[in-house]
Amino acid sequence: MAKESVKARERKKQATVERFAAKRKALKEAGDYVGLDKLPKNASPVRLHNRCKLTGRPRGYMRKFGINRVTFRELAANGKIPGVTRASW
């Protein structure tokens, strides 16, 4: 489990990206790189890192489900993810 402070920091970055998205898009279309440079560093979506919604783990993230591979395996084994079954052939 990730520390709460790390999860909160990531949520704060996400909020900053969303707040400046429209302004950032307008500056990019206008080619105003000086204006882009004046935006906060955390306003760039490149600085975001996907994290598991349940544990906050940053690695092994599965975009389709929003959780990491370890949590996915546990939930899938318990039948808690609809439509997911174990492979058998």
UniProtKB/Swiss-Prot annotation:
Keywords: Ribonucleoprotein, Ribosomal protein, RNA-binding, rRNA-binding
Any one GO cellular component localisation term in the record: cytoplasm
Annotated GO MF terms: rRNA binding; structural constituent of ribosome
Disulfide bond sites: none
Gene Ontology terms: biological process: translation
Gene3D superfamilies associated with the record: 30s Ribosomal Protein S14, Chain N
Alphabetized Pfam families for the sequence: Ribosomal_S14 (PF00253)
Domain of life, source organism: Bacteria
SUPFAM superfamilies on file: Glucocorticoid receptor-like (DNA-binding domain)
NCBIfam families: PRK08881.1
Function recorded in the entry: Binds 16S rRNA, required for the assembly of 30S particles and may also be responsible for determining the conformation of the 16S rRNA at the A site.
HAMAP family reported for this sequence: Ribosomal_uS14_1
Complex formation: Part of the 30S ribosomal subunit. Contacts proteins S3 and S10.
Family, as annotated: Belongs to the universal ribosomal protein uS14 family.
Record's protein name: Small ribosomal subunit protein uS14
Chain's gene name: rpsN
